[in-house]
C-alpha cells in the first residue's frame, strides 16, 4: 500500500466529527467532564510560571534591601503551592476520566460491531476481504479513546501556548520564529514515520489474522487431539515463528530509523532553545530584564518548545488516528445486500402452496463457479423433501437460499405465489427451524445451548425441556450433574464435554425450539449411532406431521423416508422422485444407493 499523502491526511480529519459523536453517545457526562478538566488545566502552566517570576523578583528585592514585602512573598509561595496541587489533582482526574471513558467506548463500539455484523449477509462472512475489514474495525475498538485524549490535549496545549506566546511576543517576536524553525524537522519526521507505520499495518492485516489463527491452533482444546496425533506442534510453531519474525524485522526497521532521525531532530530543537536562552541571558546581564523575567521567559520558551513539538507531532498522531478511523467506519459502511421489503407481506400461516424455485442460480462474490444453477422445483406445503448428492453438489447452499440467508444471483424463489423477498424477513426467519451440519458447540449451559434456537424463549423452561425430549437429548441431560444448568465444554470451569452424538442431540433440540412451519435438517444424525438415528427419525416423522421439512443426508436409510428426493450434481438438479421411483430409473441415485448398500454386505 502506498504511503499516505498530506492531502489524504487532512481529508482523514473529516472522520473526527463522526468519531466524537460516538464518544458522546458512549457517555455525555464523562466526555463533558474530560473537556472541562483540560480547559482548566490549560491556564495553570502560565499561572505557575508567572507566580514563580513574581516570587523571584520579591526575593531579589528583599536580598538587596531595596524593597519587597515578606508577607506578599509568602502569599505568592502559598499561591504557587496551591496551583501545583491543583495541577496534579486535575492531571490525575483527567487520567481517571480518560480511563473510564476508554473502557466504556471499547465496550460500546464492540457491541456496535457485533450488532452491525448481525445485519450483514452470510456470504459476506465467507469473503476474506470482509474479514480483513472486520479485523481492522475490531482493532479500533481498543485504544481509540487515545485519539479523543490527543485531540483534547491538542486544544488544551494550543490555549496554553497562546498564553505563553503572548509573553514572548511582547518581549521579542523573533523568538517565536526561531521556535517554529527548531521544531519543524521533528514534525516532518513524525509525519513520515507515522505514514510508514500505517501502510505497514494495513499490509500486515491478512498475515496478522493468520498469526492469530496459528496461535489458536497451537493451544486450543478444539485442536489439541489432532496436534498431538499428527505431531503438528513443530509445524504450527515454525509457521508462527516465521510470521512473527517477519513482523519483528519489518517493525524493527522502521523503529530504528525513527529513533535515529528522532535523535537528530531533538538535537536541532535543543539548539534552538539554547540560542533563545543565551539571548535572554544577555538581555538580563545588560539590565533590560529582571531575574524573574529571565526565569519566566526561559521557562515559557522551554514549555513553548515542548508544547509546539507536542502539537505538531500530535497532529500527525491525530491525523493518523483519523486514518485508522476510516478502517472502523468502512466496516459500518458495509451494508446487507438482502434488503427487507418496504411494505412486507405477513408470512402465511399456514403455508398453503409451498416454495417454488424458478431457474434459481447462486454463486459467491468474486467466484466464476456456480454453487447452484437452473434450479426448478416446488417444495409443497407439508412435504418432506430430501436432498442427496456428493460433497460440493450445492445441497447446503440450496437450503440457505430457502432460509433467505443467501439471495439468488439469478432467478427467484416464490412462497405461495409471491417472491420470497416480499415477505417480512424477521417473520420468515422465525418460521424456519434449522440445524446445519457445522452447528456451534456453545460453551454455555445446556439450557442456553438449546435456547439459542429461539432466544426470545430463553426463560421458558418447559419449552426447553420439551425440545430436549423431542430430540432425545433429555435422557443424556438427566445424567449430567447440573442437569439443564450444567456448563458444556472445557473452556470454562466445571464444564462437561459431550461426545459428538450427544452434542448433535443438543443441537437438534434447537430446531424444535420454534413452532416453525419449515424445518431444515442438514446432516442431523451424522454423529449418531444406528439405534439413536432410528429413534430420532421416528420422532422426527411424528413431529413434522403437519410441517414442511427439508432433509440433507448421505445416509439412504434416512432419506428414503422422504416424500420426494432431489438429486443434485455440480449444483444442478438431475433427478427427482421417491426412493422407489429413483431406484426404478436406475440413474445417479440408484448408483449411489447400491454403492452404499454394497458396503453393508
Residue locations for each model-derived region?
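Transmembrane helix-loop-helix hairpins at lipid-water interfaces of multipass membrane proteins
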Residues: 32-90, 167-197, 271-278, 282-292, ...
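Juxtamembrane helix-loop junctions of ABC transporter transmembrane domains
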Residues: 2-5, 48-52, 84-126, 130, ...
Amino acid at each position: 500500500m502506498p504511503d499516505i499523502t498530506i492531502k489524504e491526511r487532512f481529508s482523514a480529519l473529516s472522520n473526527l466529527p463522526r468519531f466524537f459523536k460516538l464518544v458522546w453517545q458512549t457517555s455525555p457526562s464523562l466526555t463533558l467532564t474530560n473537556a472541562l478538566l483540560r480547559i482548566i488545566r490549560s491556564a495553570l502552566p502560565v499561572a505557575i510560571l508567572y507566580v514563580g517570576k513574581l516570587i523571584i523578583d520579591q526575593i531579589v528585592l528583599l536580598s538587596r534591601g531595596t524593597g519587597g514585602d515578606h508577607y506578599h512573598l509568602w502569599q505568592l509561595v502559598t499561591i504557587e503551592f496551591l496551583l501545583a496541587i491543583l495541577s496534579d489533582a486535575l492531571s490525575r482526574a483527567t487520567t481517571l476520566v480518560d480511563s473510564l471513558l476508554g473502557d466504556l467506548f471499547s465496550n460500546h463500539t464492540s457491541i456496535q460491531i457485533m450488532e452491525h455484523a448481525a445485519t450483514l449477509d452470510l456470504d459476506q462472512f465467507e469473503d476474506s476481504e470482509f474479514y480483513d475489514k472486520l479485523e481492522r474495525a475490531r482493532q479500533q475498538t481498543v485504544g481509540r479513546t487515545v485519539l479523543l485524549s490527543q485531540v483534547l490535549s491538542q486544544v488544551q496545549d494550543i490555549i496554553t501556548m497562546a498564553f505563553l506566546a503572548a509573553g514572548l511576543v511582547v518581549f521579542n517576536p523573533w523568538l517565536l520564529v526561531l521556535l517554529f524553525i527548531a521544531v519543524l524537522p521533528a514534525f516532518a519526521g513524525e509525519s513520515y514515520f507515522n505514514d510508514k507505520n500505517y501502510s505497514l499495518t494495513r499490509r500486515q492485516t491478512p498475515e496478522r489474522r493468520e498469526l492469530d489463527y496459528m496461535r489458536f491452533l497451537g493451544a486450543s482444546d478444539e485442536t489439541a487431539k489432532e496436534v498431538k496425533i499428527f505431531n503438528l506442534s513443530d509445524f504450527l510453531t515454525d509457521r508462527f515463528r516465521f510470521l512473527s519474525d517477519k513482523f519483528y524485522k519489518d517493525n524493527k526497521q522502521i523503529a530504528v530509523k525513527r529513533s535515529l532521525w528522532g535523535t537528530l531532530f531533538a538535537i536541532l530543537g535543543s539548539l534552538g532553545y539554547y540560542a533563545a536562552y543565551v539571548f535572554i541571558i544577555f538581555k538580563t546581564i545588560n539590565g533590560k530584564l529582571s531575574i524573574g523575567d529571565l526565569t519566566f521567559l526561559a521557562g515559557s520558551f522551554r514549555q513553548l518548545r515542548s508544547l509546539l513539538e507536542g502539537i505538531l507531532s500530535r497532529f500527525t498522531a491525530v491525523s493518523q488516528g483519523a486514518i485508522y478511523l476510516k478502517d472502523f467506519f468502512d466496516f459500518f459502511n458495509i451494508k446487507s445486500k438482502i434488503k427487507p421489503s418496504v411494505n412486507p407481506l405477513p408470512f402465511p400461516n399456514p403455508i398453503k402452496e409451498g416454495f417454488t424455485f424458478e431457474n434459481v442460480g447462486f454463486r459467491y462474490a468474486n467466484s466464476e463457479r456456480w454453487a447452484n444453477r437452473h434450479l426448478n422445483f416446488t417444495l409443497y406445503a407439508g412435504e418432506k423433501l430430501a436432498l442427496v448428492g456428493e460433497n460440493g453438489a450445492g445441497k447446503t447452499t440450496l437450503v440457505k437460499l430457502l432460509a433467505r440467508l443467501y439471495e439468488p444471483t439469478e432467478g427467484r424463489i416464490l412462497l405461495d405465489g409471491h417472491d420470497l423477498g416480499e415477505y417480512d424477513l424477521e417473520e420468515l426467519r422465525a418460521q424456519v427451524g434449522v440445524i446445519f451440519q457445522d452447528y456451534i458447540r456453545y460453551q454455555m449451559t445446556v439450557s442456553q445451548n438449546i435456547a439459542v434456537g429461539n432466544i426470545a424463549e430463553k426463560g421458558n423452561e418447559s419449552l426447553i425441556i420439551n425440545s430436549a425430549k423431542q430430540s432425545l437429548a433429555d435422557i443424556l441431560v438427566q445424567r449430567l450433574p447440573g442437569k439443564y444448568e450444567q456448563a458444556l465444554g472445557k473452556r470454562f470451569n466445571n464444564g462437561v464435554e459431550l461426545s459428538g452424538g450427544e452434542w448433535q442431540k443438543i443441537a437438534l433440540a434447537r430446531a424444535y425450539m420454534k413452532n416453525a412451519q419449515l424445518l431444515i435438517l442438514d446432516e442431523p444424525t451424522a454423529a449418531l449411532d444406528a439405534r439413536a438415528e432410528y429413534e430420532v427419525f421416528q420422532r422426527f416423522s411424528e413431529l413434522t406431521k403437519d410441517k414442511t421439512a427439508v432433509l440433507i443426508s448421505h445416509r439412504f436409510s434416512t432419506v428414503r423416508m422422504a416424500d420426494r428426493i432431489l438429486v443434485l450434481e455440480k449444483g444442478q438438479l438431475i433427478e427427482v422422485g421417491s426412493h422407489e421411483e429413483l431406484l426404478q430409473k436406475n440413474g445417479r441415485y440408484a448408483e449411489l444407493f447400491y454403492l452404499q448398500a454394497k458396503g453393508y454386505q
